[in-house]
Each structure stands twice: as structure tokens, then as C-alpha cells.
């Protein structure tokens, strides 16, 4: 097993983050960067690409969770 520590860049600030159990916020370097990322998802600034996103706009399609 190699003795080299794996490091990844923080997705927000690009600071190097060691990939170890003690890195509480990995892949982020800090709680601040983690919350910035969460805020971007919540504000819909980030999204997972999909060709089938139109289903959410079709009122005739049931999602299985709605109460009628």
C-alpha cells in the first residue's frame, strides 16, 4: 500500500484537501466551502444534466407521491 496521501482540490476554492477520515468536510476544505456549494444547489445554480427534465412540467404525469 502506498504511503502517499491522496489530496483533492476543494470544488469551491481549489485548496488542497487530504483524503483522510480527519478531513471532516471532504471534498471541501471547510464548512464555509461546503455551505457555499449547498447554497448553489439550493438556488438551482447547479443541476445534474438530464434529457428527461420535462417530466416535472407535465401535470398529467404522476410522480407517485402526490395526493389527489
UniProtKB/Swiss-Prot annotation:
SUPFAM superfamilies recorded: Glucocorticoid receptor-like (DNA-binding domain) (SSF57716)
GO MF entries: DNA topoisomerase type II (double strand cut, ATP-hydrolyzing) inhibitor activity; zinc ion binding
Record text on cofactor binding: Binds 1 zinc ion.
GO biological process entries: regulation of DNA-templated transcription
Residues the record lists as binding Zn(2+): 10, 13, 29, 33
Cofactor(s) needed for function: Zn(2+)
Spans traversing the lipid bilayer: none
Annotated keywords: Metal-binding, Zinc
InterPro entries linked: DNA_gyrase_inhibitor_YacG (IPR005584), Znf_NHR/GATA (IPR013088)
UniProt similarity note: Belongs to the DNA gyrase inhibitor YacG family.
Functional note: Inhibits all the catalytic activities of DNA gyrase by preventing its interaction with DNA. Acts by binding directly to the C-terminal domain of GyrB, which probably disrupts DNA binding by the gyrase.
Record's subunit section: Interacts with GyrB.
Name the record gives this protein: DNA gyrase inhibitor YacG
Amino acid at each position: 500500500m502506498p504511503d502517499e496521501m491522496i489530496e483533492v482540490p476543494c470544488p469551491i476554492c481549489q485548496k488542497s484537501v487530504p483524503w483522510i477520515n480527519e478531513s471532516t468536510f471532504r471534498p471541501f476544505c471547510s464548512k464555509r466551502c461546503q455551505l457555499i456549494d449547498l447554497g448553489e444547489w439550493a438556488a438551482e445554480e447547479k443541476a445534474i444534466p438530464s434529457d428527461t427534465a420535462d417530466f416535472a412540467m407535465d401535470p398529467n404525469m404522476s410522480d407517485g407521491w402526490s395526493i389527489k
